[in-house]
Regions:
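Feature captures hydrophobic
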Residues: 1-112
Length: 112
C-alpha cells in the first residue's frame, strides 16, 4: 500500500507533467472544473482545479463541489500516474472510478 505522501507526490508529478504539456503544446483544453481525488484504502482525499490543461492548487482534503471526481486505491493511483496502469482499462473494469459529465470525460482523455 502506498503512503499518503507517495500519493501526494504522484499527484504533484501529474500536475507538473500536465503543466509542461500545456506549456509546450500551445493547444489549450477548454476545461475549468474543480477536481477531487479520493484514495479509498487510506481514507484521504486531495483536490485542485483543472484549468486550461493544468492542475492547479493541489491540496489535501475533499471538495464536495468537485465536478470531476477520481476514486482509486493508493497503489492504483500511483501506478496510473507512473504510467504502469492503463487508465481506460482500469476505469472500464471498475478498478478506478471517474465521475464527470460525458463531455468532460472526452476532454480529460486528451489530458491523460
Amino acid at each position: 500500500m502506498a503512503t499518503v505522501d507517495e500519493c501526494r507526490d504522484a499527484l504533484n508529478r501529474l500536475a507538473a507533467r500536465m503543466d509542461a504539456n500545456a506549456a509546450s503544446s500551445g493547444n489549450q483544453i477548454d476545461l475549468d472544473r474543480p477536481l477531487a481525488c479520493t484514495v479509498t484504502d487510506l481514507g484521504v482525499a486531495f483536490h485542485g482545479q483543472l484549468t486550461g490543461g493544468r492542475l492547479l492548487g493541489l491540496t489535501d482534503g475533499d471538495n464536495p463541489d468537485a465536478k470531476i471526481r477520481l476514486t482509486a486505491s493508493s497503489d492504483d493511483l500511483v501506478a496510473m500516474i507512473n504510467g504502469e496502469l492503463d487508465l481506460a482499462k482500469s476505469w472500464a473494469s471498475g478498478r478506478i472510478g471517474i465521475k464527470a459529465n460525458p463531455f468532460d470525460l472526452l476532454k480529460l482523455r486528451k489530458l491523460m
